[in-house]
Amino acid sequence: MSSQLVQFSTVPQIPNPPSRHRHFLSERNYIPANVYEHPAALLLERCSSLKELRQILPLVFKNGLYQEHFFQTKLVSLFCRYGSVDEAARVFEPIDSKLNVLYHTMLKGFAKVSDLDKALQFFVRMRYDDVEPVVYNFTYLLKVCGDEAELRVGKEIHGLLVKSGFSLDLFAMTGLENMYAKCRQVNEARKVFDRMPERDLVSWNTIVAGYSQNGMARMALEMVKSMCEENLKPSFITIVSVLPAVSALRLISVGKEIHGYAMRSGFDSLVNISTALVDMYAKCGSLETARQLFDGMLERNVVSWNSMIDAYVQNENPKEAMLIFQKMLDEGVKPTDVSVMGALHACADLGDLERGRFIHKLSVELGLDRNVSVVNSLISMYCKCKEVDTAASMFGKLQSRTLVSWNAMILGFAQNGRPIDALNYFSQMRSRTVKPDTFTYVSVITAIAELSITHHAKWIHGVVMRSCLDKNVFVTTALVDMYAKCGAIMIARLIFDMMSERHVTTWNAMIDGYGTHGFGKAALELFEEMQKGTIKPNGVTFLSVISACSHSGLVEAGLKCFYMMKENYSIELSMDHYGAMVDLLGRAGRLNEAWDFIMQMPVKPAVNVYGAMLGACQIHKNVNFAEKAAERLFELNPDDGGYHVLLANIYRAASMWEKVGQVRVSMLRQGLRKTPGCSMVEIKNEVHSFFSGSTAHPDSKKIYAFLEKLICHIKEAGYVPDTNLVLGVENDVKEQLLSTHSEKLAISFGLLNTTAGTTIHVRKNLRVCADCHNATKYISLVTGREIVVRDMQRFHHFKNGACSCGDYW
């Protein structure tokens, strides 16, 4: 591209005017002595749109005014102003004697539409046509270079500008300053600024905006301070430029000072200022003030609406974001791509598929369905609404996939229980030479954590290290979480201890890891260590601590944390916190307290609260509270067969066979099914899956023969099958059914295919049943093996006939 500046073999051919206009060129009807008084001239002066201009153009030709310099200049200028540079060129080309101002206007037009190639071609043509460049020509070109981040071309124009004698011109230097800032070369922009023999408000505003837009917020504020020290009053552009820096630093006190200055200067009524203030207050956490400003605006543009929608989305209030979006539509404001993306983000957070589909349809009507950023937002929305296949279909049709597109799909699969698909897409992405970023690796690590396969965990850890991202706090936090979920809690702690920087999410991941492994005391110790530092715990921290206490029977410590959350840290309680408290009390057998806690909740209990209560009733075989909890669960979530199965198990433990039958009939009537149990074990880098009673595995005969002998051995050691868990068949058949549960098959296969002393790692999609839990303790005893089982709730470390959960799960 840069060679265009020094040599062109041919002058670019710009289309001639339409033939229907050519015959007018020689016609000259009556023209007043002063062309400015001609009706066509008056129409051009009042022209306010491209449509009007196209209607006026034939009048100019018809009246023979085309050769008048006034009309030539006015037509070219207006077509450029309205962004129709091709039509401006069709007016420009046939002119016999072109004034220099026409060349300058055309170049400005190309710059306005940010067409660098055509702007450069036209600039070279000007040299061929002996048009001497003026300083503004260079500023136009520099503007386009900045808009397109073309640093190399921008530097060449800088060189030409110096050769042309404009190196110290204020306008030229301001243009250079702006170009370097937009090309993310802020230090170069600052050098230009410092070399200026004189500076005006525009040059100061340019450097302020440069710092602000390039993430150097403190420097932006410093420049405003220096500007004021030189007795230059900040303009409304200064305020709009510096407010994003205030937002980035969350300096609301400074923001309020700027707001006060804007009011005293009379700028607060300007729509750009009001919009920037709304954005600043929202990003500084003062959403109420932002909304008051927004509601008080006498005039709003689409950017104002977008700022308010984004404010609610970023402050985790998607319901209000959708209300603002709806109000925007009701007031007839046409949404932009930014509006649509904000609304889609809100729908994703709400899991509102219906409204998400409506916005999808709206985006098609607005012609935004080919906008890659909008499509990426649609993919994310469908993934969060559990419509992953719809998202994958959109991704497949997307012609220009960006890194964001790949990341959205990988995360979507990871969050929807399809980790294998996530890894496959990651592999495809790398094969297409798309370079992964931090977000990609965090998503892939999340998928591997879901798989809970140590080999995969070590593989991605190696990839991360080779990518030099093993010191990135987001990636290392994900690694801590992944290793904990893969059963390697010691490796997780090792990575945690080696981290030079930790976020609250890092502490949360490690505390949660200890909790799911049943190491409640270790979780509490780490929580105490966290409180001594500078990072404050958040709601997720307390949820992890309470859950850790629940899994370890540390009831009093859990209660203390629950009340500390509100009293010491002013953290709002969520439904998850209430559910964790019911689980804490219920697991400990304090069912009366748990039920009283539910009844006294200040908000209506949700499914997770009653689900925790029902789970506790199964542990402690309490039919009374189980029926109460189940009744509420069937109302709140009638389509989940899991709660019906749980209630049936409680009835079965109480030998209430008639009730068991009623639950079964109810499930059949509603078409509800029990989720089949599946256990997975990794052997020699390959994952093997087993379902209860299945003979699909190629080594089934060996597995069942080995398992039969193993059952005999553990019976000799004291194992007694819990036949109460099976109904409707004879005792010997009950034992046979119990012996072929998926956990036992996976463990047997692991023992058959590993050497003595090797730890067996098993993953199950459901809660481990009581019989398998008991049997696995005996298996660890008679084989001398450590067996780690991860079920849907926690980890169980079986060793020497005991489990880390202490039979408390």
UniProtKB/Swiss-Prot annotation:
Biological classification of the source: Eukaryota, Viridiplantae, Streptophyta, Embryophyta, Tracheophyta
Role of this protein: Involved in multiple sites RNA editing events in chloroplasts. Involved in the editing of the site 7 of ndhB (ndhB-7) and site 5 of ndhD (ndhD-5) transcripts, which are two plastid-encoded subunits of the chloroplast NAD(P)H dehydrogenase (NDH) complex. Involved in the editing of the site 3 of rpoB (rpoB-3) transcript. Required for the activity of the NDH complex of the photosynthetic electron transport chain. Possesses low endoribonuclease activity in vitro.
Protein name: Pentatricopeptide repeat-containing protein At1g11290, chloroplastic
Family label: Belongs to the PPR family. PCMP-H subfamily.
Keyword Chloroplast: yes
Species name: Arabidopsis thaliana
Chain spans, region Type E motif: 609-684
Note, other: The DYW motif is dispensable for editing activity in vivo.
Major site of localization recorded for this protein: plastid
SUPFAM superfamilies (alphabetical): TPR-like
Stretch forming the transit peptide: 1-46
GO biological process: mRNA modification; mRNA processing
Deletion consequences: Impaired chloroplastic NAD(P)H dehydrogenase (NDH) activity.
Chain positions covered by the region annotation Type E(+) motif: 685-715
Cellular localisation: Plastid, Chloroplast
Keywords from the UniProt entry: Chloroplast, mRNA processing, Plastid, Repeat, Transit peptide
Region (Type DYW motif): 716-809
GO cellular component: chloroplast
GO molecular function, one term: endonuclease activity
Keyword Chloroplast on entry: yes
Gene (UniProt): PCMP-H40
PPR repeats mapped onto the chain: 68-98, 99-133, 134-168, 169-199, 200-234, 235-269, 270-300, 301-335, 336-370, 371-401, 402-436, 437-471, 472-502, 503-537, 538-568, 574-604
